[in-house]
């Protein structure tokens, strides 16, 4: 039986703010787009924190639903992954790819003194 009064000390916004990394990626461990987003960030040498919403404490149904609902309110999307640079939503994997191509990713990362590898800067 699930306790509907269950309250985690952390919301999605708190998880982002408390991250030691400038980039936070909300993910599902089995999701191919989530895996692709992780690979893209690794290839770009971007430090990031992954919050897997289907593992550990985040599997608890009430907490999971609350975090997913909050992410949807923050981003306007109910899909994963969701990438944040600082507190700014970049979006999902295809949005992150587009941000790389149009220079938005570079601009957001520069605020954290992160430089993309040569040849990928726009």
Locate the predicted segments by residue:
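Thiol/disulfide oxidoreductase modules built on the thioredoxin-like
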Residues: 71-79
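Non-catalytic, surface beta->alpha helical segment in thiol-disulfide oxidoreductase systems
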Residues: 85-120
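Local sequence-structure signature of Cys/Sec-based thiol-disulfide redox active-site neighborhoods
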Residues: 7-53
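Thiol-based oxidoreductase modules, predominantly thioredoxin-like and allied folds used
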Residues: 47-68
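Alpha-helical interaction elements in eukaryotic regulators
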Residues: 8, 30-33, 37, 63, ...
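Eukaryote-biased feature marking scaffold/signaling PDZ-domain proteins and nuclear chromatin regulators
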Residues: 18-21, 26, 62, 66, ...
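N-terminal organelle transit peptides
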Residues: 1-9, 122
